[in-house]
Amino acid sequence: LIVNTLFSKDVIKYHDYLKILIKNNFKCREKNETVLYFTSVNKVRIILSGSMALDKKITYPKNVDYLILAYQGRSDLDKKIVNIIKVIKPKNIILTHFDNSFPPISKNVNISNLRNVIPSNIGLIIPEYEKEIVL
C-alpha cells in the first residue's frame, strides 16, 4: 500500500499538497496517538474516530449510537471494520474519508461491498456532497 501510494501518479499531480500534508502531520500530532473522541448530545452517544487503528489495551465506549469512521488507508478495510464493530458495537456507522480527500496519500475506496460486510442491524450512512445528515 505504501509503495503503491509513493509511486502513484497522484504524487506528481499533488506534490505541492503532499508537502503540506507531511508538514501538518508532524505539526498537528496529539501525543503521537490515534485520536478518538467520544461525546454525548441529548443522550445520543457519538464516537468520532480519526483512524481504524484500535489499541487492544484500551477499553472503548460500547453500544454507541453513531460511530463516525475514517474509512481509508488500509488494504484490509473490510476485515478491519468487522473488528471495530465487534469492539465498539455501534448502532450506526457514518463513513468519512472513503473518497480521495487527501491526495496523494488517499484514494477513492470501493464501498460497494460494504453493506455485505456490516451486519444488517447496523445502520450504514454514506455522506453525499452538500446533503445534510440528520441524526
Residues covered by each model-derived region:
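Core dinuclear metal-dependent hydrolase active-site scaffold
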Residues: 1-62, 131-135
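Conserved phosphate-coordination/catalytic loops
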Residues: 27-30, 75, 108
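Structural motif
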Residues: 44-46, 66, 92
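Active-site metal-binding loops of divalent metal-dependent hydrolases
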Residues: 50-52, 71-73, 98-99
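Alpha-helical scaffolding within the catalytic cores
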Residues: 54, 77-83
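Binuclear metal-ion centers of metallo-dependent hydrolases, dominated by the metallo-beta-lactamase
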Residues: 60-61, 82, 88-135
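Active-site beta-loop-alpha substructure in enzyme catalytic cores
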Residues: 63-70
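Loop/helix-junction capping segments adjacent to catalytic residues or to phosphate/diphosphate-binding pockets
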Residues: 75-78, 104
